[in-house]
Curated annotation (Swiss-Prot):
Name listed for the protein in its UniProt record: Bifunctional protein HldE
Active site per UniProt: 264
Source organism of the structure: Proteus mirabilis (strain HI4320)
A single Gene Ontology CC term: cytosol
UniProt KW keywords: ATP-binding, Carbohydrate metabolism, Kinase, Multifunctional enzyme, Nucleotide-binding, Nucleotidyltransferase, Transferase
Pfam families: CTP_transf_like, PfkB
Region (Cytidylyltransferase): 344-474
Pathways involved: Nucleotide-sugar biosynthesis; ADP-L-glycero-beta-D-manno-heptose biosynthesis; ADP-L-glycero-beta-D-manno-heptose from D-glycero-beta-D-manno-heptose 7-phosphate: step 1/4; Nucleotide-sugar biosynthesis; ADP-L-glycero-beta-D-manno-heptose biosynthesis; ADP-L-glycero-beta-D-manno-heptose from D-glycero-beta-D-manno-heptose 7-phosphate: step 3/4
Enzyme class: transferase
Amino acid sequence: MKVTLPDFNKANVLVVGDVMLDRYWYGPTSRISPEAPVPVVKVDTIEERPGGAANVAMNIASLGANSRLVGLTGIDEAAKALSNTLSQVNVRCDFVSIATHPTITKLRVLSRNQQLIRLDFEEGFSNVSPEPIYERIQQALPSMGALILSDYAKGALSHVQQMIQLAKKAGVPVLIDPKGSDFERYRGATLLTPNMSEFEQVVGVCHTDDELVEKGTQLVKDLALDALLITRSERGMSLLQANEAPLHLPTQAQEVYDVTGAGDTVIGVLATALAAGKPLAEACFLANAAAGVVVGKLGTSTVSPIELENAIRGRADNGFGIMEESQLKQAVALARQRGERIVMTNGCFDILHAGHVSYLANARKLGDRLIVAVNSDASTKRLKGESRPVNPLEQRMTVLGALGAVDWVVAFEEDTPQRLIASVLPDILVKGGDYKPEDIAGSKEVWAAGGEVKVLNFEDGISTTNIINAIKKK
């Protein structure tokens, strides 16, 4: 299956469900309390993240799509914190505020990467009138490409069947992340996304893939669903439809640090891809790839278009790391969040040879990621003469990107990459040859930002000019 990213900017997705605030208190612990046999945590870091349906909405916004969120909150500090955090990532919040209930909040205390305790602040909203939510759904649906109902059994979806009918009447696909063993309440939905445990609570234990397909397909028919997407942890996902062959997607996770919120990412990416015009099978492929990315992060997390692009194509087929400048800056920002050191070099690289390969490998060893900035065809011609380049820019970038040492390749139009380097500000700027560091384009900007500038040797006797001259003699 050839899969490409859709234009997420054109997608409009409405999320309705149980919103909550995830709070994390971090700190060291070095002693036991004299008051009780419990560790004393000296809190030095506090984080607040949207959880539940709010995390789904944030996942949608992180793709660049238009995300609107409807849910129930209290009138309290937690509701303000949740709204502020979501507005900063371009989620449009349309909350129903209930004075008699607190905003659902989950507080986790952690030390040395170990969760010591979780405190839940909630009363549930099952006794709250659904009419204000109905009104918000009806008002939003005409402009939406998909509706997500995110059920955490906290009360926002107590009347879920009426919400499904509103979406069907408007012709909007409705995707549901279910909760509990009563799937009958989701009858008529477009698609459900249970995990394996939730699925087996409803249909019984499945000992084989064939049994899973048989029971899942029957469930699709019994509940008048269009499809069922079962998330199966390390075994990936299975898409089941009444009159289609099953689609099994293997997991794409390389390392698993935390599965918190992975289901939110799956349904968020799935619905957004559908709203952007992707067919169901491709949308599931994208959701599976996104899940593989997000479980490699700690806590509830999101996935960016760049991360998703790299995930669906893999290191060997992702355009070989070829990026526009704006994409590169986003990728560098993400790498820095992971604590990675960025190395950058530049050149024409007209005919890639052993000297280039050795030089780039040595440059890569200086840090964690290597950017290669490449002169455009016009820039190369001005620098090298009318007969150059021998290979056009696209081919030069493709060959460079195929090297294991190279993470990202970007083009520049100017005679030097000074402006580009000043924009990216690598941790280490590298140039090959006999340059003085102060003469290297971009060195002043890198030094001013606290970075390093290094000069590496090229291998003697190997150059593009020598190769061209040797070819001409033959």
